[in-house]
Amino acid sequence: MNTSSGWSRQPPASLSELEIHWLFAPGSLTERLSALGEYSLEPVDQRHAAACAADASLLGVEPDSPIWVREVVMRLDAQPCVTARSIASAHALETQWKPLTGYGSLPLGHILYDDPAIVRAPFECALLMPDDPLDAISRRYARAAAPPRARRSAFVRNGATLVVSECFLPQFWSGFAQARLAGA
């Protein structure tokens, strides 16, 4: 995956052990969050758009190609804790990722971890930059002095790529991550 804009498979030296734990935790984030409190997922936006240069690079398409974008906020005990942005090429959505078209408020994990044809790439993490598309949605739910911590991973099904990026908001770090680390 493209490592521009600060994204890397290696955690920045400034991250704490707790942050590294959550940014590189394997498996379903939905399951991990559900163990910490009352979990809910709220769709923020789902649309077709023209791929910006960064999205095009991640998906292996030309800039301005049609892509599908889904943005959600995940809440614990009614507090926004994680924002997520998923992207796929329009062609991939029409073929290999067709089940995602009407997914609404269901977590993507329900299909990503039950299909043996889906292969997950290693995580990348970043301190989000203001020009990152995930930063825009994250700033709607939290203002932070420090850059938000985020992770992303590509899921590939029969050659079609879906990229899921997740930003852990300050409310997550202060209210849930450390207090319940042992159970996660």
From Swiss-Prot:
One of its GO terms (molecular function) is chorismate lyase activity. Pathway: Cofactor biosynthesis; ubiquinone biosynthesis. It catalyses: chorismate = 4-hydroxybenzoate + pyruvate. Substrate binds at residues 70, 108, 166. One of its GO terms (cellular component) is cytosol. Keywords: Cytoplasm, Lyase, Pyruvate, Ubiquinone biosynthesis. GO terms for biological process: pyruvate biosynthetic process; ubiquinone biosynthetic process. The keyword Cytoplasm applies. PANTHER family: CHORISMATE PYRUVATE-LYASE. This is Probable chorismate pyruvate-lyase 1. It comes from Burkholderia pseudomallei (strain 1710b).
